[in-house]
Amino acid sequence: MGKPFRKTKFEKRNKMNLKQKFLPFLFLGITSLATAQEIKSEFNKEVKVQKKMSYILDMPQNTKSKIPLIVFLHGSGERGNDLEIVKNHSPFTYKNLIKEPVAILAPQCPANTWWDTEAVYFLIKEISEKYKIDKDRIYLTGLSMGGWGTLKLAGEHPEMFAAVSAVCAPTDRAMWANIHNYKDLNIKLFHGGMDDIVLPENAFNFYQKLHPVNPKAELTIFPNDNHNSWDSTYSDPKLYEWMLSLKKSKN
């Protein structure tokens, strides 16, 4: 029978050294747990953000009184830095149908982005302060991506606009969730019944949410139009007659 195993002095000393080495780390962990705290607070600070946006403003000359302003938001195909193309498919094309002097403002969305509605809001405010604009007669319209921007901006700042018209506009759940923001707006929706780019369901679903809180809201479907329902919308003089007949103070 072999002798019982005995630890040498070296092994005992080595084991004690290991314990001594790891002991500070054990205390460190306990100390860390003891000093941890949960902080609940609120961040509240004014943050300045630079906004930059190109635009075209068609401003009648030699007008003595303040004039109405139509703001037009283009679709995704007109993004970039060629300002001339923002006038495509827009009220600019049908200015001859508008029976009174109006200013038309068309900002341009940068390439590869969607509308920054906060930037558009501050642009409209600046234009309405800088020029002779009737602030009770500011109208907002847009097509496709610009229709989405129109509904988004109108929901964020309904107090700014006398009337709103969105054409072949994508809609989203954030708009549906905040549908009460649209309850006092004069608003018309237009869509092509054969639209295979932005499906008509976008208009139907939004209108179903909108109409119960805003019975005066209207939806027009052009049954034979595809995504180009802007042609049928902006070529109709009645759109401009409807817009210009409305004022914020007399909604």
Where are these predicted regions, by residue range?
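Gly/Ser-rich "nucleophile elbow"/oxyanion-hole loop immediately N-terminal to the catalytic nucleophile
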Residues: 64-65, 112-144
